[in-house]
């Protein structure tokens, strides 16, 4: 999470002055939240990654929009994951591509059957009328959606995430949709804690503590880079010697020839044996994972069957008492 906020740009004080004039028109005052929200770090990482990728592709900060999915039990909402949404601008108003949303929802339902659509997210400063316009479109898909906004340009050390719900207030005799801010808590699972800890260690300056895997990959990258530069230098010398640009140095050419013959030959029987052994090990691990998943599914099926059988057996015995 800290890395998601650290990957931001800079923000000026003039933007804060403009936002301060906009916020009162879309924020409801004196309204308490009606639901309790638990937010998973994976959602924040997804939004931050979405924003950074769009900024890299476009060369400038871009507003991104996506969907929030999770679980809801009564007044308790748990936001567990998210996915991106397509949108386009018509007359300076953002229009969500609903067909794309329904396609993505169907795909997520195949993998995460227990998760449901909870709301949407975007990036930027405090809520403004354009967010109200998008929120009304989301209300056509789901009733009372959540609205999450992440500010990637803030310099504050606090988590730059705010969660809102919509309320209807009477302003000048007209029903007007406003946002009411909700309090939220962070809920993490073991896999998320490991991932967030790894991201937090990998700072943008590279001065932070790196994981063992990262250090190993960095060392390999440096070695391969040095090897590539040396081989390129030898190749350029051989080409220059053939072209007559530099005089032949038989000692250097003999060393290059010997180096080429020292390289391992990948067509040996030992290499083939080790290669096939490794392929078999990888295939076996994948096969064991599939078997484990199948056994778990069968176990759940047997448990449900036993519960149903016991209920039917009790029903038969109860009916037998009256005959």
Swiss-Prot record:
It is found in: Cytoplasm; Nucleus. Coiled coil: none annotated. GO terms for biological process: protein deneddylation. GO terms for cellular component: COP9 signalosome; cytoplasm. Keywords: Cytoplasm, Nucleus, Signalosome. The keyword Nucleus applies. SMART domains: JAB_MPN. Residues 37-170 form the MPN domain. Pfam families: JAB (PF01398), MitMem_reg (PF13012). InterPro entries: EIF3F/CSN6-like_C (IPR024969), JAMM/MPN+_dom (IPR000555), MPN (IPR037518), MPN_CSN6 (IPR033859). GO terms for molecular function: metallopeptidase activity. Disulfide bonds: none annotated. CDD domains: MPN_CSN6. Component of the CSN complex, composed of COPS1/GPS1, COPS2, COPS3, COPS4, COPS5, COPS6, COPS7 (COPS7A or COPS7B), COPS8 and COPS9. In the complex, it probably interacts directly with COPS2, COPS4, COPS5, COPS7 (COPS7A or COPS7B) and COPS9. Interacts with the translation initiation factor EIF3S6. Interacts weakly with RBX1. Directly interacts with COP1 and 14-3-3 protein sigma/SFN. Interacts with ERCC6. Belongs to the peptidase M67A family. CSN6 subfamily. Component of the COP9 signalosome complex (CSN), a complex involved in various cellular and developmental processes. The CSN complex is an essential regulator of the ubiquitin (Ubl) conjugation pathway by mediating the deneddylation of the cullin subunits of SCF-type E3 ligase complexes, leading to decrease the Ubl ligase activity of SCF-type complexes such as SCF, CSA or DDB2. The complex is also involved in phosphorylation of p53/TP53, c-jun/JUN, IkappaBalpha/NFKBIA, ITPK1 and IRF8, possibly via its association with CK2 and PKD kinases. This is COP9 signalosome complex subunit 6. The gene is COPS6.
């Amino acid at each position: 999470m800290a890395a998601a906020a650290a990957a931001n740009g800079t923000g000026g004080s003039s933007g804060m002055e403009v936002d301060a004039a906009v916020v009162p028109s879309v924020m409801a005052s004196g309204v308490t939240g009606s639901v309790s929200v638990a937010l998973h770090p994976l959602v924040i990482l997804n939004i931050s990654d979405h924003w950074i990728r769009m900024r890299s592709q476009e060369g400038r900060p871009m507003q991104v929009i996506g969907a929030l999915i999770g679980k809801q039990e009564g007044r308790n909402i748990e936001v567990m994951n998210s996915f991106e949404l397509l949108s386009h601008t018509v007359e300076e108003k953002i229009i969500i591509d609903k067909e794309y949303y329904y396609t993505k929802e169907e795909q997520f339902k195949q993998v995460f059957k227990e998760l449901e659509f909870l709301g949407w997210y975007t990036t930027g400063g405090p809520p403004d009328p354009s967010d109200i316009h998008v929120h009304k479109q989301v209300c056509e898909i789901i009733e009372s959606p959540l609205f999450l906004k992440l500010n990637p340009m803030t310099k504050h050390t606090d988590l730059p995430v705010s969660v809102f719900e919509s309320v209807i207030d009477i302003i000048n005799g007209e029903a007007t949709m406003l946002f009411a801010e909700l309090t939220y808590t962070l809920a993490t699972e073991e896999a998320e804690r490991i991932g967030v800890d790894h991201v937090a260690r990998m700072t943008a300056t590279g001065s932070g503590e790196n994981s063992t895997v990262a250090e190993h990959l960095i060392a390999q990258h440096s070695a391969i880079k040095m090897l590539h530069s040396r081989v390129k230098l030898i190749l350029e010398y051989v080409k220059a010697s053939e072209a007559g640009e530099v005089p032949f140095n038989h000692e250097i050419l003999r060393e290059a020839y010997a180096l080429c013959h020292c390289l391992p030959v990948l067509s040996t029987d030992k290499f083939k044996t080790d290669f096939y052994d490794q392929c078999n090990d990888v295939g076996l691990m994948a096969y064991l994972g599939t078997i484990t998943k199948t056994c778990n599914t069968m176990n759940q099926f047997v448990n449900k069957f036993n519960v149903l059988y016991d209920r039917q057996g009790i029903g038969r015995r109860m009916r037998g008492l009256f005959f």
